Amino acid sequence: MSEPLRLFLSEEVARGIRAHGAESYPNEACGAMLGVDGERREVRALFPLVNRRDDSPRNRFAVTAEDVRAAERAGAEQGLELIGWYHSHPDHPARPSDFDREHAWPWYSYVIVAVGEGKPREMYSWRLADDRSHYLPEELPAEVSAPPAG
């Protein structure tokens, strides 16, 4: 049996994802996750992006090729690499949609935070299977996946 997939991130990084989701509500927030992928995959910095989706920003997000290049440059300047993406699901669970799966790439981590009525809720991470047929759950530290207290 293979080891479960894991993504490590600090409470500070988790707060950043949740804050971006709350600030962007009722639209989806999105951003890049910069970090390392060696002995363990760890997010060390966020690179918030503007949701460039004009037609349905409440339930979709889009980034441009220039956004991707900017995130990669920012990571390189810090000795980090682009290891994944985060986005919010306003008034929906933190589970990937079919649209998310159709527009995702294998290897990357995808963190989704649910934002209900403007308040961040649970947060989960996923990786797309190599055959693109489904997502594989990726464990987050327990202290960051649960909804924030209060």
For the regions a protein language model found, what residue spans apply to each?
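Conserved beta-strand-loop surface patch within small alpha/beta domains used
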Residues: M1-L82, P90-G150
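Conserved, mostly hydrophobic/aromatic
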Residues: W85
